[in-house]
Design a protein with these regions (language model features):
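Nucleotide-activated chemistry modules centered on ATP-dependent adenylation/adenylyltransferase
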Residues: 1-188
């Protein structure tokens, strides 16, 4: 899963480097757009595709099919997937019911994998060594059809490592770390 942030971009680069610059045929880089992503995030994901020559499949939540494929040009930019989810739920995500990630990113990505014929897969998540609480939380859950891998945590990669990598690149996410990718997120 590609979140559109620096850490997931760094994780993708490491994965590409481990496989001679290309993704294995059974590996899918998937970016789930909420429709509330900052334009800088969309530009960053598009730049990764263009500069690294990697195929990233863009998806959005679809009420009926679970997901729909979109592109950089057709991706929602006015909050449509988020608004549709709020209409379906009849309330807003909040600190107690944080359903936006689950319903706008995780479930569409799972629907994408099932549509490709997978009944079991590993979801690789860009959580770092300095995010131990988040890693423990993710690893403690039963994810059903998929397993979770946190290779950056296992490799003891920290925020400083990720920021150092991007400082050496000819492009970067044009956001400060505290800003977050989704413009409505109350977690940042």
């Amino acid at each position: 899963n590609i979140s559109g942030g620096r850490t997931s971009g760094y994780m993708l680069r490491r994965h590409l480097d481990a496989h001679d610059g290309t993704l294995p045929p059974d590996c899918h880089a998937v970016y789930a757009n909420t429709g509330r992503e900052r334009h800088e995030t969309l530009d960053f994901v598009a730049a990764i595709t263009e500069r690294w020559g990697v195929d990233i499949t863009w998806i959005e939540r679809d009420r009926d099919a679970g997901y729909r494929e979109v592109t950089y040009d057709t991706a929602a930019r006015d909050g449509e997937p988020f608004a549709d989810l709020i209409t379906d739920k009849h309330y807003l995500p909040n600190a107690v019911a944080r359903f936006c990630t689950q319903d706008l990113k995780i479930r569409p990505a799972a629907a994408f994998m099932r549509a490709r014929g997978y009944s079991q897969w590993t979801s690789v998540i860009g959580l770092r060594f300095d995010e131990a609480r988040r890693v423990a939380n993710v690893r403690s859950r039963d994810h059903g059809d998929w397993d979770i891998a946190c290779p950056l945590y296992d490799a003891r990669v920290t925020s400083d490592d990720v920021l150092g990598f991007w400082r050496a690149q000819p492009f970067d996410l044009a956001l400060q770390s505290y800003q977050g990718n989704c413009d409505l997120c109350f977690l940042k």
